[in-house]
């Protein structure tokens, strides 16, 4: 149990997808203007990562890994296309569910919901799972922790950006300029976790 708690804390803080690996920056910067929208997208990313990482773990271990289907056959060259296909299918299902049951959130996310399909944080989580050879249980914890870490980062950035509306930011830095500086400072803050040994 201690191993799984350690993996969860590590994936949220120490190896944060957004602030340590800088994955998912497109939607991270574009949707982080309001906390409510950021929280909604963060929940969507948590759901997709929590499902996509373990599902792709099963696909990799039961189909794509060397000697998984037939002795001497290695289908790992199909990793990228298969993982992207699974992620795309999951995002389409999530999009239909949000459209049906949560229309305001679906409308607020707009074009960024389909962009979760190509969000490199999702694909990065799946790739790290394969690279680190996580088992099924570890992949569930890692997917959930990575999603929560990404959501924590985008909601924190949105909160800061909402407060910066009332600040006297120099004209040349308004908009994305000050946002990049803020993200850099947040990343420096998260770097302090890198010395933690779990």
Curated annotation (Swiss-Prot):
GO CC terms: Gram-negative-bacterium-type cell wall; plasma membrane
Protein name per Swiss-Prot or TrEMBL: Na(+)-translocating NADH-quinone reductase subunit E
Subcellular location: Cell inner membrane
Assigned keywords, A-Z: Cell inner membrane, Cell membrane, Ion transport, Membrane, NAD, Sodium, Sodium transport, Translocase, Transmembrane, Transmembrane helix, Transport, Ubiquinone
Catalytic activity: a ubiquinone + n Na(+)(in) + NADH + H(+) = a ubiquinol + n Na(+)(out) + NAD(+)
Family to which this protein belongs: Belongs to the NqrDE/RnfAE family.
InterPro entries recorded: NqrDE/RnfAE (IPR003667), NqrDE/RnfAE_oxidrdctase (IPR050133), NqrE (IPR010967)
Quaternary organization: Composed of six subunits; NqrA, NqrB, NqrC, NqrD, NqrE and NqrF.
Keyword Coiled coil (UniProt): no
Pfam families linked: Rnf-Nqr
Chain's role: NQR complex catalyzes the reduction of ubiquinone-1 to ubiquinol by two successive reactions, coupled with the transport of Na(+) ions from the cytoplasm to the periplasm. NqrA to NqrE are probably involved in the second step, the conversion of ubisemiquinone to ubiquinol.
Species in which this protein is naturally found: Vibrio alginolyticus
PTM summary: The N-terminus is blocked.
Activity regulation, per record: This reaction is tightly coupled to the Na(+) pumping activity and specifically requires Na(+) for activity. Inhibited by korormicin and 2-N-heptyl-4-hydroxyquinoline N-oxide (HQNO).
Domain of life: Bacteria
Enzyme Commission identifier(s): 7.2.1.1
An annotated GO BP: sodium ion transport
Recorded topology in the membrane: Multi-pass membrane protein
Entry's Gene Ontology molecular function annotations: oxidoreductase activity, acting on NAD(P)H, quinone or similar compound as acceptor
Positions of transmembrane segments: 11-31, 39-59, 77-97, 110-130, 140-160, 176-196
């Amino acid at each position: 149990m201690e191993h799984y708690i350690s993996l969860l804390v590590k994936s949220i803080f120490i190896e944060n997808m957004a602030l340590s690996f800088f994955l998912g920056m497109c939607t991270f910067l574009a949707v982080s203007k309001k906390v409510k929208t950021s929280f909604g997208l963060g929940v969507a990313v948590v759901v997709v990562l929590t499902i996509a990482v373990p599902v792709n773990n099963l696909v990799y271990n039961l189909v794509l890994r060397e000697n998984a289907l037939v002795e001497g056959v290695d289908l790992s060259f199909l990793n990228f296309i298969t993982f992207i296909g699974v992620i795309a299918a999951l995002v389409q299902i999530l999009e239909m569910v949000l459209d049906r049951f949560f229309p305001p959130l679906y409308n607020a996310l707009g074009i960024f919901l389909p962009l979760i399909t190509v969000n490199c944080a999702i694909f990065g989580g799946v790739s790290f799972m394969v690279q680190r050879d996580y088992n099924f249980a570890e992949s569930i914890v890692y997917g959930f922790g990575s999603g929560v870490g990404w959501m924590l980062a985008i909601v924190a950035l949105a909160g800061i950006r909402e407060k910066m509306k009332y600040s006297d930011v120099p004209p040349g830095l308004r908009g994305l300029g000050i946002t990049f500086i803020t993200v850099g400072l947040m990343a420096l803050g998260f770097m302090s976790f890198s010395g933690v040994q779990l």
